[in-house]
Structure formats: structure tokens, C-alpha cells
Swiss-Prot record:
Name of this protein: Large ribosomal subunit protein uL29
Alphabetical list of HAMAP family matching this protein: Ribosomal_uL29 (MF_00374)
InterPro entries in alphabetical order: Ribosomal_protein_uL29, Ribosomal_uL29, Ribosomal_uL29_CS, Ribosomal_uL29_sf
GO-annotated molecular function: structural constituent of ribosome
Similarity-based family: Belongs to the universal ribosomal protein uL29 family.
Organism phylogeny: Bacteria, Pseudomonadati, Pseudomonadota, Betaproteobacteria, Burkholderiales
Transmembrane parts of this sequence: none
Top-level taxon of the source organism: Bacteria
UniProt keywords, alphabetically: Ribonucleoprotein, Ribosomal protein
Gene Ontology CC: one annotated term: cytosolic large ribosomal subunit
SUPFAM superfamilies assigned: Ribosomal protein L29 (L29p)
BP GO terms, sorted: translation
Amino acid sequence: MKASELRDKDVAGLNQELSELLKAQFGLRMQKATQQLQNTSQLKKVRRDIARVRTVLGEKGSQK
């Protein structure tokens, strides 16, 4: 997801997106630990999406 798309969302939507991404990251980490994960690049994508969401949340928090 692009940062410009995230900036259009409100704080509640961003928090919801963050919780979904964290759950996805947990699931991927468990799959990796049990050697069921085929595409390990998904971990990198989810990790960076989480960072993008947290960055936009920080920007919105500092605007107030």
C-alpha cells in the first residue's frame, strides 16, 4: 500500500489497518518458524507496510 493512499485515511482506519498488518505479520512469522512459508518476501512487504502506517499515524499525531 502506498503512503499517499494511507494519508487519505482517518486515524481509526489507520489503526485498523495496523492491527490487520500485525496479525498478518504474526501469521507469517509462525509459518516461517514451522517452515511452511514459501514466499519469504511477504515478510518484508508486511514489515514495510507496518512502518508506512506507523509513519503516517505519527504525521497525523504531530499535525494536531
